[in-house]
Amino acid sequence: MGTRDNESMGLTRRGFLTGALALGAVGAGSMLAGCSSEGGAGAPASDERAWDQETDVVVVGTGFAGLAAAHEAAKAGSQVVLVEKAPEKYAGGNSRACAQAIWSPEKTAEGVAYFKEITGDYHLVGLDDAVIEAYIGGAKENADWLLDEFEIETKTHNACEYPAAKTASAVGDSNTLIPAEGLGNARVWAPMFEVVGSESGVTSLFETAFTDLVFNEAGEAIGIEAQQGESPLLIKAKKGVVLACGGFEYNEEMKANNCRYPSLAWGTPYNTGDALTACRKYDIDFWHMNSATPATRVGVQATWLDDDFSECGFDCEVAGDAGYVWTDKYGKRFMDETRSYQHGYGRDALFYNDSAKMEWPRLPFWQVVDESTLPFMGTSGSGWVHIVGGTSAPDSTEELLSSGLMVKADTVEELASQMGVEATILQESVDALSGPDDEFGRAAEKKRALSGTLYAVQLQPIMVNTNGGPKRDASARIVHTDGTPVERLFSAGELGSVWAWYYQGAGNVSECMVFGR
């Protein structure tokens, strides 16, 4: 178990998040009420326990959401225990592995309208306007907050993912922040982690898995139960508990019960739905359980890597070269491979289910390339295997071949034999790269005929994250099934995300920061 203690934990501090800056757009009054120092003062005697540690605020998770919450609480004078399931070298959750872009529309009203349009009326049910307005209203503060608090410089970029939306043009040309030094490589997360880890009053507990919540008889969250190796740990939170520990991408049972489509996962393998398991024991409402980014990337499971990475999705998608084609299990092409992926929603063709055969004919599917295409596979610059594991597809051709996930041949006929498909069907799919016309509308300039040695790798969709979890209000408070807040219990980030249907890229990072702080 790793511990980072930056100041001995005093018991008398200023109230949790007392400054208006700390609350921003997420409802100062109600947040303060939920975390006032008086909140647990009248706890019944039966709530007295043999606590292993006591602090003001417990924050679970070291991604953007957890770091934002811990930073603002410590800045306001509270003592914070920051709990992380992973070892320190693997801390950070999906925040560490993502592209580091932050959706931050400058115009609140227009941003709210765009969010509502792409979410749609059906999925807006139960999503209060106040929550959306708190999110979008707080997002425009992200650039100044990152610069002022962490000296992270950003620049603006137009990354509207759904330009066909009626409200798209109103969002503006500067709707997304990206690090001044460029995307990827944890350029936002790493400096945040360093600052928070060195802050006075923040104690970081690594290899400490959150397992349960602790309530007093008044129904207030007063602490958590955790596990450090073989040892249980009981941590008292005198002012509040913040759950910011991500979703359930690596919990196969939860995925099967909530996500319609099978897929691999792209981020941290420590996201196994621990907070959902805990919250389900209590009168806590849930939302957006079927919301996930279904095919943001495509790739294989990294079975040849060590146990820290062997469950992870390994990006093999081609970017920057026109020499590739996708086919179903039978070698038949089925879509324009180059269409905008829109975080997977532009790839609905992958999830076609043939009810007559009771199968997913395109799960898995084949990506056929030639030798010159190999350096362009899996170069997105994000993902757990790439960022934390330090490897990518261009470096792993031999591993892909030896694992049986990739085959190669000198002719289409030989390749078809190794793929187990009919040569005539595969030949037709490969020939589609040669002609100007295209059955699925792929532009001629985005096609290049294949030559020389051919390769085929069998791919699956890779989701970035799930969005389901405990429902939150505009003040980041987790709520009961009747809509009233669970006192002193908060959430931020992908755990119970506000995103319910179509997802705007970089939106999760933004909400991590807004609701976290």
Protein language model features and the residues they cover:
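Conserved redox-cofactor binding core of oxidoreductases
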Residues: 137-232, 252, 299, 435-451
